[in-house]
Each structure stands twice: as structure tokens, then as C-alpha cells.
Regions:
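A short, structured loop/turn motif at beta-sheet edges
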Residues: 31-32, 61-63, 87-95, 123-132
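Hydrophobic ligand-binding cavity/cleft-lining segments
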Residues: 1-55
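Short beta-edge strand/loop motif at the mouth of beta-sheet-based domains
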Residues: 22-23, 42-81, 92
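Short beta-strand segments that buttress and anchor functional surface loops
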Residues: 68-74, 98-100, 109-110
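Beta-strand/loop substructures that line and gate deep hydrophobic ligand-binding cavities in soluble
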Residues: 106-155
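Intrinsic-disorder/low-complexity, polar/charged segments enriched in Ser/Thr/Lys/Arg/Asp/Glu/Gln
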Residues: 18-24, 31, 67, 81, ...
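Hydrophobic pocket/interface hotspot
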Residues: 34-35, 44, 68, 86, ...
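Hydrophobic/aromatic beta-strand elements that line small-molecule binding cavities or substrate pockets
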Residues: 25, 57-60, 82-88, 117-126
Length: 170
């Protein structure tokens, strides 16, 4: 993207270390398969949450304003519905989704002690025979970032990505 006023190239995904969490992974899985794992409900159910949690009942519409909804189920059977919105989907390259708004860009109500809004930017690039996966998760304030990190962002997202690799390698 180029700034028309200055002519300089802009990167709209520059992380802010005070607000954002960034996970970078290299894998033997090509970008096409990682993208497929992120956009196919039957595959998401197999890897999206660190076991023994599950993510079920996926509704995904790969268009700006489309739904990115699921239900997280705890080992005890407690259900946590999650409604989100696709902001951008560029096949095999980028998936951006948020829980700050729901399908149709309707403002979301994120209630509860552990609730916070975030926007996730998933970027995929070819790397060797596989891919480089970069997940940038942006938060509105430092407290939300800290809450997400404290609840296990790095362990959870790493475990989930390991599960993605397992599912897509079979």
C-alpha cells in the first residue's frame, strides 16, 4: 500500500509492542494448506483450540463483513460462543478477523470479566518448501493485551498451530 501524499510504502500491519502480541512460526506446510486449515470449518474443529478444548459449530463467510463464528467447548462441557467478523481474506496470503464487530460489521458486545476485543492478522508467506506464519493480534489497550498474554496467548496459539501442522500433515 502506498501513501499517496508522501509516495512512501505503508505497512498497515506494523505491530505496536505495547498493544499487540505477535507469533511467528516456520513450518513445512505450504501457505495454501495453512489457509485451508483456517478457512474450512471441518478442519478448524480439529485444531483451532489447544486440546482438550474444542471449537465447534463454525460459521465462516470469507468476505469482508462475513461471519467468523464458533463455539468453544471446555473439557467440562461449558460452552463459550464467539461471534466475529472477517475484515479481509486474501486466498493463501492473509486472513484478518475480529471479535470487535460481528457479521455485517455490527458492533459486538464483549461482556464478562475475561472479555476483551482483538483483531487477528494472519499472514502467510512461502518459505523454503513450507511457509512462514505470522499472527499479529492487536488490542485496544495495554490492559487487554496483558490479559490476553496472561491467559496463555503464546502457549495456546503455539499449541494450536502445532495441532494445525499435525492435521494438515496427515
Amino acid at each position: 500500500m502506498r501513501n499517496t501524499a508522501t509516495g512512501k510504502t505503508m505497512n498497515p500491519f506494523t505491530p505496536n509492542p505495547e498493544l499487540d502480541l505477535v507469533l511467528v512460526r516456520e513450518s513445512a506446510i505450504p501457505p495454501e494448506l495453512v489457509y485451508q486449515a483456517y478457512t474450512t470449518p471441518e478442519l478448524l474443529e480439529q485444531w483451532f483450540c489447544p486440546r482438550p478444548y474444542k471449537a465447534i459449530e463454525w460459521e465462516i463467510e470469507l468476505t469482508p463483513g462475513g461471519a467468523f463464528n464458533s463455539v468453544i467447548v471446555s473439557p467440562e462441557g461449558q460452552r463459550f460462543p464467539g461471534a466475529g467478523c472477517i475484515l479481509q481474506a486474501v486466498e493463501n496470503k492473509t486472513l484478518i478477523f475480529t471479535n470487535a464487530v460481528t457479521a455485517g460489521f455490527r458492533p459486538a458486545i464483549n461482556e464478562g470479566e475475561d472479555a476483551f476485543s482483538f483483531t487477528a492478522i494472519i499472514q502467510l508467506e512461502p518459505s523454503g518448501t513450507g511457509s512462514r506464519y505470522t499472527a499479529t493480534v492487536m488490542h485496544a489497550d495495554a490492559a487487554s493485551k496483558q490479559k490476553h498474554e496472561t491467559m496463555g496467548f503464546f502457549d495456546g496459539w503455539n499449541a494450536a498451530f502445532d495441532q494445525l501442522i499435525e492435521v494438515m500433515t496427515v
